[in-house]
From Swiss-Prot:
Coiled coil: none
Protein name: tRNA 2-selenouridine synthase
Tagged with keyword Zinc: no
Reaction catalysis annotation: 5-methylaminomethyl-2-thiouridine(34) in tRNA + selenophosphate + (2E)-geranyl diphosphate + H2O + H(+) = 5-methylaminomethyl-2-selenouridine(34) in tRNA + (2E)-thiogeraniol + phosphate + diphosphate; 5-methylaminomethyl-2-thiouridine(34) in tRNA + (2E)-geranyl diphosphate = 5-methylaminomethyl-S-(2E)-geranyl-thiouridine(34) in tRNA + diphosphate; 5-methylaminomethyl-S-(2E)-geranyl-thiouridine(34) in tRNA + selenophosphate + H(+) = 5-methylaminomethyl-2-(Se-phospho)selenouridine(34) in tRNA + (2E)-thiogeraniol; 5-methylaminomethyl-2-(Se-phospho)selenouridine(34) in tRNA + H2O = 5-methylaminomethyl-2-selenouridine(34) in tRNA + phosphate
Amino acid sequence: MQDRQKAQDYRALLLADTPLIDVRAPIEFEQGAMPGAINLPLMMDDERAAVGTCYKRQGADAALALGHRLVCGDIRQQRLEAWKAAYQRFPNGYLCCARGGQRSHIVQRWLQETGIDCPLIEGGYKALRQTAIQATWQLAQKPILLIGGCTGSGKTQLVRQQPNGVDLEGLARHRGSSFGRTLKPQLSQASFENKLAVELLKINARQTLKRWVLEDEGRTIGANHLPECLRERMAQAPIAVVEDPFALRLERLREEYFIRMHHDFTHAYGDGAGWQAYSEYLHHGLFAIRRRLGLQRFAELTDTLDRALAEQLSSGSTDGHMAWLVPLLNEYYDPMYRYQLEKKAANIVFRGTWQDVANWLKAQ
């Protein structure tokens, strides 16, 4: 066990999905964490704030003494039991704090007193975070091919089928448009970047990689923005454009946004609350682009959406949604994407149907 007491091979830890018992305060964890980490704090937010204030006013010794007073007795025992349970569940796990300092060492010592020898991450979360940033920069230097196409072209599915494909929208938990949110909340920016770095490392490790295949994304995916090093490379990358018939795109969008999202909401919240959440989701997506549509057009499409929802609720049919989706594509989404694509016309290396692009990718 001695060789595991301090870990410095950060890439190996990230590649192995090493469980991390992260003892930072909840606010620190929410701001940024590694995939596979569970938050079992030594100090809660208010306790950490009090210790920090004490440190500034009275110094390190007084702050340490305050920390021990705050985390003692039943509180200390409850947290110790949680760490013990986590280590028993993840015996290959590591303790992690902000910089591999006192917090992880204190928890390690308390566990040792119970007979558990849990190693820690030397350098803590900060060292892992720096490793993730460096890995993304390094791996972003490899060639990139983008998959482009209007909304409903099946780009994400195509990317997912590639052994060297990176599903940026899946990592961001958002599909990129005003209707793009999923039932899972988006991660913080740092957590998204960390997850992306680990995904790049894993794909790179399991094959001889000639290039990445990514979806042609904007600078942001929902609330997350792409790392600048990756975005700069994507701006110059060649693009294969999917050009499927409009009717086929409509059917994909019907399945994804009206059938699947309705199912997901009702499965998560039950019929009544799920329907309400689904309805609010569609209304919110339309509301988010009201200024670009113009307020009169927004009001017209909202009325059409309301009628479509009433029809879906009464009969289960999603046909009514086509009456607002078709003009939304024709008047907003398609012109916007085509304008963006025109600016990158020199980068287009292939055009074809979804199947044409899939076959072309196999032949590369």
